[in-house]
Amino acid sequence: MYTLTQFGFREMMDCRTRIRAIFNDDPATLAEAGERVVKFFYEGLLDDTGKPACALVRMFKTHRFSDLDPQSRAVALRALPDAETVPDLRCLTLLATAGDQPEWNQVANSRAHRVIPLPTEAMVERAPMIAQLITQLGGKISNVLRPDPNLLFDTKDATYNLFYVPRAVGSPFIVSQKEFVEAYRIASVLGFGGLLASGDFFAAILFSHIPITSQVADLFKVVGMNLKVAFLPLARRPLFKA
């Protein structure tokens, strides 16, 4: 466990090692892998009193609409009724969630973020946080909506491995200010992830009660890169149990 206000180089090195080992016991599904990740960060990052430093930790991954399980497909269709007509539609899918509120600990309880269809760049740009998350972690929105295998390992991708909102209050990237940021005392937001060999995009997002300094955020670039390395072999696992 790590006290977030005291997270330094030593803690980063230890966290990096633990992240690389998080999937040693092979997860059967992407959801199981995501559950390990959100639990690791929610339970492992603490404030100065020993309580969870994060109000909420979530993990997302893009998935082809045609490859979604029936329940997830139904959720996508409610959000985008003509989803079946969009060629090779990608959906940002909530793999796992852990947080302070009981309803934040079950994917099925998520109303707005369980499955988010991403039909066009214009529609993605209307969701500021998703657009910024993709831009910071995936390089270009077009790379996520229409993956090009020739670009997946572009060296530029290595620089887009951190999404950082130092002050959540008033941030244009977090639209739900009163209902979420103010109500649950969100101070900073940190995200890491990127593009996988499958062409899919993934991200772990931490909504912290305590301010995260730029120095601490920089250390999580290494943590995020190691999470990506650990997650790479799992990219083609089934989303959920059949």
Language-model regions, residue ranges each:
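Helix-to-coil/beta transition segments that act as allosteric "coupling" elements at the rims
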Residues: 121, 127-146, 152-200
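Intrinsically disordered, low-complexity terminal regulatory regions
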Residues: 1-157, 209-242
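Short, charged/polar micro-motifs that form catalytic or ligand-binding hotspots
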Residues: 20-28, 167, 180, 184, ...
